Amino acid sequence: DFEALARAGLTLTGVPTDLGGLWQGPAQSARPVAMLLRKLAGVDPSLALVASMHPTVLLMWMTGTVDGGPVGWKKHRDGVLGMAREGHWFGTIASEPGIGGDLLATKATARPKDDGTWGMSGDKFMGSGSGMTSFMMTVAVPEGEQRPDIFLIDARDLAWDGSQGLKMVRPWDGVGMAATQSHAFRFDDVRVVRHGLLGGALDLLPQIGPVIGFMFSAVFVGILDAAAAEAKRILGKRALQLSAFEQSSWIKAQNQIWLAQQAFEGMARSLETDAAGTDVLHGKLAIADLAETALNGLSHAVGGASLSQSSPFGQWMQDVRALGYLRPPRALSYARILGGLAS
């Protein structure tokens, strides 16, 4: 599937137009890229979620200055984005146990090596796309510094048995987004490359954070699109024969899906006007809550058949729960919104 998507050009969503890609900036490209992910999610949510991480990770290299920056930045940037142009997939393994999704709270460390690379050590999980992605973005604190930075792992020939410092300690066993291969790993001096802005990459998060939340939300709106269509296929011809409870459950769920779709549209417009602010946080939280409630309502309307493994509703109900945990997770989103209200 990933090879087919690369051949179709989807990896170019993480490459700017000046280097032969499709990305023109959030205002021009966020909506069309998100719509691709939304359509894909209606067929395979796990595939779409992993694919959504490709352009969002590469925003760390597409955003900001091109010709300025530290010595070697442009060469580093062109090299990373050139790999995406060649069809390589990028993913992320930045999450860690006990930090609540806050990248700045990382416990991982990195020490410089003689050849200019770094050796990273620490525990990481939620490595979505493990085995499918060629490169993985991560976060660690450089030796002798206080603030974390972005690092890139070349995962193409990296064994998982500990022989090269990387050991899988827990395979992904999620009941939702079951096929994302979001394994947990222990890093012991694994070779990584530091981001070329040398400490400046995390300063880009306020700019790119809304785009990340929007792309993730697109996947879950795609699930809602598919769920609404499937419910109509099953229930449409016998709508008047449904019980009052089934009818009201269906109508309420449809209203909730409509609201989620409007929230998504509002997020897109905010990005297109460069005034995203907390709008995307509100939209992502709204979609997360509405999606869970809507899938529950559709299950009530469809009945016990929705629990069958031959029905997609049971899997969709688990899949949509993931949005609240994706960056920024609910706790951080609430904290940022509260900070804005209190200021």
What kind of feature is each model-predicted range?
Residues V169-W258:
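Glycine-rich beta->alpha junctions and the first turn(s) of the following alpha-helix
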Residues D123-G165:
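A short core secondary-structure module
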Residues G236, L240, W258-D289, S299-S308:
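C-terminal helix-coil-helix/basic helical segment that borders enzyme active sites and/or dimer interfaces
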Residues F125-S130, I212-F216, L323:
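Glycine-rich phosphate/pyrophosphate-binding beta-alpha loops
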Residues A244-I251, G277-H282, S311:
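Short, charged, amphipathic alpha-helical segments
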Residues S217, L224-A227, A231, A253, ...:
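Amphipathic alpha-helices that form helix-helix packing interfaces
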Residues G304-S343:
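Glycine-rich phosphate/cofactor-binding loops in nucleotide/flavin-utilizing enzymes
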Residues E3-A6, L12-D123:
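Glycine-rich flavin
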